Amino acid sequence: MITMDCLREVGDDLLVNIEVSPASGKFGIPSYNEWRKRIEVKIHSPPQKGKANREIIKEFSETFGRDVEIVSGQKSRQKTIRIQGMGRDLFLKLVSEKFGLEIP
């Protein structure tokens, strides 16, 4: 279940706090970490030479149909991404539909 602690609307954009598990198979958003207040994200790429960051940007852009950038945590597993033109409600709806996460 995703709580609002990991999501923040800034103008027309949405900031999302994520925790990345690199080299984990295919891309997915399997759960929400209550303690860290971050959405857990699995990606295929290893954390080498920016491969993981490029995959995060590509997969989020394709999944949500929006431009995405990493705004903090470029060299960390804990990152904050900006999804342009995405509101909180639409994000929660799409995550629920595409990844089956329970939304409060």
Swiss-Prot record:
SUPFAM superfamilies: YggU-like (SSF69786). Gene3D superfamilies: YggU-like. It holds the Pfam family DUF167. Signal peptide: none annotated. SMART domains: DUF167. InterPro entries: DUF167, YggU-like_sf. Belongs to the UPF0235 family. This is UPF0235 protein MTH_637. It comes from Methanothermobacter thermautotrophicus (strain ATCC 29096 / DSM 1053 / JCM 10044 / NBRC 100330 / Delta H). The lineage of its organism: Archaea, Methanobacteriati, Methanobacteriota, Methanomada group, Methanobacteria.
